[in-house]
């Protein structure tokens, strides 16, 4: 016989699946076991005991004449003979005698089998087997969604993640931290209420006792203690769990196969319950103890009518009623399950209660199969959902990332990355990190902080520890800031650089930095930037002196005009977008430096001539061809630097002689062919760059420039240099490479301060030994072919090689 344990495979599932079995599924499982035992018990009785016992019936002679001759005379009487009555005087000696049928054992077995098959009702015969089959079907229906590949894979994945989330140290840390904060808030509220009842203090006193100020150090202590309990490995495991939960949520929320399958298997169980109740109630009366059997087997047994006893009828009748009770309870439970499935919205799951209890406000609601599984888990233990919700929170994930970040970037490791930037400040560059390490604020000597490609940066109040911080660079970073940190930056920050791809990376809090002196903006703005409200608040930057915008604006923003009264330097790098409507420049009366780079200008803007305080003008990479307007620069008495490089200028007008205050002049990367002698009447020029043009001749008037320190004609077509060039005694840098020069005059020895000389790319055959008189010129400052350098006397070469 098959033992009961062999049927367990029909209802077995992984022990972890129990979290998805609500109380009604557990209850129906126990009912199934009870019904299974009924079926197995009935089948065992069917196999091990006699199913039916039959005896032949005696009939009247008129009805049995054909068979009288085949039986003995003792049984031929028309009425059964009564058994002899024992004598009361001698009861022990009287022998009991019954009716003889003259049938052997084989005939009785044959009669029993024939009557069992022909006369016994099928329900009485197959009742235990029906119970067994129905129970197995119930078990299969209850556990089918645990076995079906389309659903079991999701369930296994979910339970695997759920168990890891439940046991993760990060879950305990996050919930205990929130619990600690909640208790602090309650204590603070009680203290505040008691104090307000006992004393009538002013607003200043109540502010000191407020939670926002008092609880900060307490929370800091909680963070420190809990942070030590989570090592680096556990932090990485928790980080991986967050990623798994995200991917699993996206995958499971797409469909509702689990919900649909559970509903269908429940509906199937209800239908089966109704069928079982219907036919069992109708047929249970067919289980009878006495059965009349009429079979035509006279030729083999001599009898046709038999009276049979169904030996297990009494027990089967009781078992059937018991089975009906179990099935009824099972069915009512399934009906309640259907009510629960259709009455409640199981395709949506709200974490509102968890959000209120834990204080983690950003836990999202879920839907479809994800929601259904969470509803099922709540029937098992709501604590699972509460702990699992921690891994759905971005706030919790950010805290974990912050903790891992702090463990990875220690103060010593950060100090190794310190460097000096272009502003001669001690700078810490952080590129492509998951966040801003809290350990940064332990480097108190930091003067400049540079963040690149870091999303969701939160600048905490601890930035106030950086007493020397003056410069902040944000390149493609979305930044939020604590109110205390903003107050600190308002007072201390001098330089802010922001590089953004969209307006969301342009921090809205930067417009309140009242002590900011330099602002650099790099990113794509709308062409109609004057209507961009995010720039209108620049007027609050009362201390702003330098403003640089590298974008694609079509006109100067009105926000820039709002700070024109104190703006001293403005740079617009326009990436080739034509800049029009420059009349707003006239309002910048205090402007000393102006850069209009790559703005597609064809003429020098007339508005520039109104900037009487202008000292430097840079019109790089425009489309200037004619600069006749240069005569108007004579009104700009303070103009000392003029850069007209990287344009298409073909000639220099003679009016340039009127710019007597010029000290730095750059015409490099143009198409100039002739240098006017009037150029050298600007005798204050110290820096003159004429490289990358088509110049063939240098006028001898260049000797007038006695203040000249830098002169470059690199990449021109000059064939000879005038001797007057060597009258410029203060010349330190001379670049004459990539020309057509064949001889270098020995008078170059007159340039005693010369420290950099580029002669490479000419037709020189020998270098004059007078180069040795240039005591400041060393080998590193002499750009020349190695073979040509060897033409110098050995003592000159040795002199240049010595430092």
Swiss-Prot record:
InterPro entries: Leu-rich_rpt, Leu-rich_rpt_typical-subtyp, LRR_dom_sf, LRR_domain-containing, LRRC8_Pannexin-like. One of its GO terms (biological process) is protein hexamerization. Glycans are attached at residues 64, 70. Residues 1-22, 147-266, 342-803 are cytoplasmic. Gene3D superfamilies: Ribonuclease Inhibitor. Residues 44-125, 288-320 are extracellular. It catalyses: chloride(in) = chloride(out); iodide(out) = iodide(in); taurine(out) = taurine(in); 2',3'-cGAMP(out) = 2',3'-cGAMP(in). Belongs to the LRRC8 family. This is Volume-regulated anion channel subunit LRRC8C. The lineage of its organism: Eukaryota, Metazoa, Chordata, Craniata, Vertebrata.
């Amino acid at each position: 016989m098959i033992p009961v344990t062999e049927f367990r495979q029909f209802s077995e599932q992984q022990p972890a699946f129990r979290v998805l079995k609500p109380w009604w599924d557990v209850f129906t499982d126990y009912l199934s076991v009870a019904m299974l035992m009924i079926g197995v018990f009935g089948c065992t009785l069917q196999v091990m005991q006699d199913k039916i016992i039959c005896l032949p019936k005696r009939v009247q002679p008129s009805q049995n004449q054909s068979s009288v001759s085949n039986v003995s005379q003792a049984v031929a009487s028309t009425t059964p003979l009564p058994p002899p009555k024992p004598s009361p005087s001698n009861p022990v000696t009287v022998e009991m005698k019954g009716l003889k049928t003259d049938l052997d054992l084989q005939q009785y077995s044959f009669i029993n089998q024939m009557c069992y098959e022909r006369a016994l009702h099928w329900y009485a015969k197959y009742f235990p087997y029906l119970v067994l089959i129905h129970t197995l079907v119930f078990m299969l229906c209850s556990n089918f969604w645990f076995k079906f590949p389309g659903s079991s894979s999701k369930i296994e994945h979910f339970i695997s993640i759920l168990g890891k989330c439940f046991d993760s140290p990060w879950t305990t840390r996050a919930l205990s931290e929130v619990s600690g904060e909640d208790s602090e808030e309650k204590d603070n509220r009680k203290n505040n209420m008691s104090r307000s009842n006992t004393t009538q203090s002013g607003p200043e006193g109540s502010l000191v006792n407020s939670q926002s100020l008092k609880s900060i150090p307490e929370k800091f202590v909680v963070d420190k203690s809990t942070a030590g309990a989570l090592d680096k490995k556990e932090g990485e495991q928790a980080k991986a769990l967050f990623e798994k939960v995200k991917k699993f949520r996206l995958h499971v929320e797409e469909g509702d196969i689990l919900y649909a399958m559970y509903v269908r298997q429940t509906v199937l169980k209800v239908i089966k319950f109704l069928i079982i109740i219907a036919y069992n109630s109708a047929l249970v009366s067919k289980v009878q103890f006495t059965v009349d059997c009429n079979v035509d087997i006279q030729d083999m047994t001599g009898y046709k009518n038999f009276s049979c006893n169904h030996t297990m009828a009494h027990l089967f009748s009781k078992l059937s009623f018991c089975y009906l009770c179990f099935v009824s309870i099972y069915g009512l439970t399934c009906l309640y399950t259907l009510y629960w499935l259709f009455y409640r919205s199981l395709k949506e799951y709200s974490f509102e209660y968890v959000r209120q209890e834990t204080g983690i406000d950003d836990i999202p609601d879920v839907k479809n199969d994800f929601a259904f599984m969470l509803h099922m888990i709540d029937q098992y233990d709501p604590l699972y959902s509460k702990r699992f919700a921690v891994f759905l929170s971005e706030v919790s994930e950010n805290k974990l990332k912050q903790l891992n970040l702090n463990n990875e970037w220690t103060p010593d490791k950060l100090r190794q990355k310190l460097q000096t930037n272009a502003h001669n400040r001690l700078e810490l560059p952080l590129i492509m990190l998951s966040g801003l390490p809290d350990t940064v604020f332990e480097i108190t000597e930091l003067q400049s902080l540079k963040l690149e490609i870091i999303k969701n940066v939160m600048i905490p109040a601890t930035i106030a520890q950086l007493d020397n911080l003056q410069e902040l660079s944000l390149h493609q970073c979305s930044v939020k800031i604590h109110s205390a940190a903003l107050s600190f930056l308002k007072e201390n920050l001098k330089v802010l650089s922001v590089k953004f791809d969209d307006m969301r990376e342009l921090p809205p809090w930067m417009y309140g930095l009242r002590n900011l002196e330099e602002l650099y903006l790099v990113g794509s703005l709308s062409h109609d930037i004057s209507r961009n409200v995010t720039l209108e608040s620049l007027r609050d930057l009362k201390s702003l002196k330098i403003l640089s915008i590298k974008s694609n604006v079509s006109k100067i923003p009105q926000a820039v005009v709002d700070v024109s009264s104190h703006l001293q330097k403005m740079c617009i790098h326009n990436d080739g977008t034509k800049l029009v409507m420059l009349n707003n420049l006239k309002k910048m009366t205090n402007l000393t430096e102006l850069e209009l780079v790559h703005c597609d200008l064809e003429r020098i803007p007339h508005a520039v001539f109104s900037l009487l305080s202008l000292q430097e003008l840079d019109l790089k990479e425009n489309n200037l061809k004619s600069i006749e307007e240069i005569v108007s620069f004579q009104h700009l008495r303070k103009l000392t630097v003029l850069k007209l490089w990287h344009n298409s200028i073909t000639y220099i007008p003679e009016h340039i002689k009127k710019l007597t205050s010029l000290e730095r002049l750059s015409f490099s990367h143009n198409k100039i062919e002739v240098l006017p002698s009037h150029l050298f009447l600007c005798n204050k020029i110290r820096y003159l760059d004429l490289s990358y043009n088509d110049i063939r001749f240098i006028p001898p008037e260049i000797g007038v420039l006695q203040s000249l320190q830098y002169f470059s004609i690199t990449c021109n077509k000059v064939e000879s240099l005038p001797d007057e060039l060597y009258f410029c005694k203060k010349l330190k840098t001379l670049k004459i490479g990539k020309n057509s020069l064949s001889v270098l005059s020995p008078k170059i020895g007159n340039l005693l301060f010369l420290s950099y000389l580029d002669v490479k790319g000419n037709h020189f055959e020998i270098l004059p030994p007078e180069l040795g008189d240039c005591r400041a010129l060393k080998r590193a400052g002499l750009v020349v072919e190695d073979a040509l350098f060897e033409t110098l006397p050995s003592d000159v070469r040795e002199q240049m090689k010595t430092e």
